[in-house]
């Protein structure tokens, strides 16, 4: 989770608390993961309270890894400000340090939500918490709009 500080100053951020819990187990044929996050905001007029749950899996397939992820975010401060995210990605190793990857991801927003996809090769729901400058900074025009992303790339680790 992150706060896009370029969208404006974070007010009262020092009083926010987060509870994070995650569990994963490698079954050999697949590796499921579950994550839960809860945000407690001391000043709901400035910061939203929410909880988020994510379920995903990573499965060896055709010499690479196929990853699938689904998450739900429940905004506990605003009505109709929840979101779903679904994504999948396949990564194929060309060498020990170089991978090709491709995937697709989508965020489905409620009518009062404007959550966006963070640029990059992953399949997780990321949040833009500033209700006045949603998705691309154009204000509330993007409330209730869904966001999709198709990505391909190459990753080399040095």
Predicted region positions:
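Outer-membrane beta-barrel and related beta-rich outer-membrane complex signature
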Residues: 46, 112-136
């Amino acid at each position: 989770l992150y706060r896009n500080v370029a969208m404006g100053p974070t007010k009262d951020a020092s009083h926010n608390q987060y509870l994070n819990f995650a569990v994963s187990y490698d079954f050999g044929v697949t590796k499921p993961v579950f994550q839960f996050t809860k945000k407690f905001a001391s000043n709901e007029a400035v910061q939203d309270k929410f909880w988020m749950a994510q379920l995903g899996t990573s499965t060896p397939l055709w010499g690479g890894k196929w990853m699938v992820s689904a998450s739900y975010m429940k905004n506990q401060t605003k009505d109709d400000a929840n979101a779903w995210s679904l994504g999948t990605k396949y990564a194929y190793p060309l060498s020990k340090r170089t991978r090709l990857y491709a995937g697709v991801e989508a965020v489905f927003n409620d009518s009062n939500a404007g959550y966006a996809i963070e640029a990059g090769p992953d399949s997780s729901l990321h949040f833009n918490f500033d209700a006045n400058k949603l998705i691309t900074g154009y204000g509330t025009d993007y409330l209730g709009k869904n966001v999709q992303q198709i990505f391909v790339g190459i990753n080399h680790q040095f």
